[in-house]
From Swiss-Prot:
Name of the encoding gene: HAUTX2
Physiological role: Neurotoxin that paralyzes freshwater crabs at high concentration.
A GO CC annotation given for this chain: extracellular region
Propeptide, residue positions: 19-33, 61-67, 95-101, 129-135, 163-174
Keyword terms of this UniProt record: Cleavage on pair of basic residues, Disulfide bond, Hydroxylation, Nematocyst, Neurotoxin, Repeat, Secreted, Signal, Toxin
Disulfide bonds: 40-51, 43-58, 74-85, 77-92, 108-119, 111-126, 142-153, 145-160
Location relative to the cell: Secreted; Nematocyst
Protein family according to the UniProt entry: Belongs to the sea anemone BBH family.
Modified residues (Hydroxyproline): 39, 73, 107, 141
Organism: Heteractis aurora (Banded sea anemone)
UniProt-recorded name of the protein: U-stichotoxin-Hau2a
Length: 174
């Protein structure tokens, strides 16, 4: 609204609502003319002291055409057709396959390290081998007069059988 119109409207409202200090009965007032202040605009017609909107008096509104843009804009594989996006496979980039994780199945054991999808033996990763102690057996086993002590045979005379003594000075050829 224009500032002049607002001022005039406020002024007229104040005049209508103002109470005169003199009694209304004492003063003869002339009737106010049937004119709307300010005058009615384009789409309005004066009816009594008011303006009434009459649509047939209004000029046609000019509508701004909406731009033919899809909101949000179309993505990689899509092309705008009117206000919509249509999928066009030829516009799609080649799909990137996710590489399979580099995990050996089954997972590598103690002495092995994964290289790519395979397990490679790494001796430094191997735990020290526990050697089984050799049994405490002398090789060859101890004979008649001997007893095993650790890995050796020790002669024990008490284990020896009594020797048969051959007669002395016997002629062997007779």
């Amino acid at each position: 609204m224009k500032p002049i119109f607002i001022v005039a409207l406020l002024f007229s409202t104040c005049l209508v609502n103002a109470k005169p200090s003199i009694n209304d009965a004492d003063i003869k007032r002339e009737p106010e003319p049937n004119v709307a202040v300010p005058p009615c605009g384009d789409c309005y017609q004066q009816v009594g002291n008011t303006c009434v909107r009459v649509p047939s008096l209004c000029p046609a509104r000019k509508r701004e055409p909406e731009p033919n843009v899809a909101v949000p804009p179309c993505g990689d594989c899509y092309q705008q057709v009117g206000n919509t996006c249509v999928r066009v496979p030829s516009l799609c980039p080649a799909r990137k396959r996710e590489p399979e994780p580099n995990v050996a199945v089954p997972p590598c054991g103690d002495c092995y390290q994964q290289v790519g999808n395979t397990c490679v033996r790494v001796p430094s990763l191997c735990p020290a081998r526990k050697r089984e102690p050799e049994p405490n057996v002398a090789v060859p086993p101890c004979g008649d007069c001997y007893q095993q002590v650790g890995n050796t045979c020790v002669r024990v005379p008490s284990l020896c059988p009594a020797r048969k003594r051959e007669p002395e000075n016997q002629d062997l050829w007779s």
